């Protein structure tokens, strides 16, 4: 649908031509205000989302430990000894003697012990995750200006409207 055709200019005066151009610009701006007040002005949309994911990983580790233990043992030994003695006697007499002896013995024993130790280990793991996101966008009003100029049939004005509306929409939507 095109706006009213206000281009039939009377060649008798330049003032009327300029006045009609001002009126057309004003009506076009009113049309944009009316157009933007409805929800269907956002017929174009874009989506951009970010998501966070969770993952699981497995790892292996090595550790070292030290321990101390105590043990008790029992042993048995045998020994041998030799002795010498001297004695004197008279008639029916009595004698006394002394002797000395030495002996050696050996023994063996067994024992048990317990100990405790500590160790540390390190491991690595990998995980994957997925995420979703949503976004919204607005329609580019420059397309409406282009359509309006196309209906008017003015190639030069169409180009000017297209450039101006592009910068206008870009600055407004930043």
UniProtKB/Swiss-Prot annotation:
InterPro entries in the record: Diverse_Func_Domain-Protein
An individual GO BP term: rhythmic process
Sequence repeats: 49-50, 51-52, 53-54, 55-56, 57-58, 59-60, 61-62, 63-64, 65-66, 67-68, 69-70, 71-72, 73-74, 75-76, 77-78, 79-80, 81-82, 83-84, 85-86, 87-88, 89-90, 91-92, 93-94, 95-96, 97-98, 99-100, 101-102, 103-104, 105-106, 107-108, 109-110, 111-112, 113-114, 115-116, 117-118, 119-120, 121-122, 123-124, 125-126, 127-128, 129-130, 131-132, 133-134, 135-136, 137-138
Swiss-Prot/TrEMBL keywords: Biological rhythms, Chloroplast, Plastid, Repeat
Localization, UniProt: Plastid, Chloroplast
Positions with biased composition (Gly residues): 50-134
Chain intervals for the UniProt region annotation (Disordered): 46-134
GO CC aspect terms: chloroplast
Annotated region described as 45 X 2 AA tandem repeats of G-[TA], given as residue ranges: 49-138
Record-given protein name: Period clock protein
Species name: Acetabularia acetabulum (Mermaid's wine glass)
Organism lineage: Eukaryota, Viridiplantae, Chlorophyta, Ulvophyceae, TCBD clade
């Amino acid at each position: 649908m095109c706006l009213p055709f206000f281009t039939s200019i009377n060649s008798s005066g330049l003032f009327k031509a300029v006045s009609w151009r001002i009126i057309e610009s004003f009506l076009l701006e009113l049309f944009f205000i009316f157009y933007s007040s409805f929800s269907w002005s956002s017929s174009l949309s874009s989506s951009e989302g970010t998501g966070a994911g969770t993952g699981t990983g497995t790892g292996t580790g090595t550790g070292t430990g030290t321990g101390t233990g105590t043990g008790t043992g029992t042993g048995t030994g045998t020994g041998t000894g030799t002795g010498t003695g001297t004695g004197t006697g008279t008639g029916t007499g009595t004698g006394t003697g002394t002797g000395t002896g030495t002996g050696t013995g050996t023994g063996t024993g067994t024992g048990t012990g317990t100990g405790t130790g500590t160790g540390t280990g390190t491991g690595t793991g990998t995980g994957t995750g997925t995420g979703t996101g949503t976004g919204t966008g607005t329609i580019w009003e420059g397309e409406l200006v282009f359509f309006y100029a196309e209906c008017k049939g003015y190639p030069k004005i169409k180009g000017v409207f297209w450039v101006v509306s592009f910068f206008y929409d870009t600055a407004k939507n930043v």
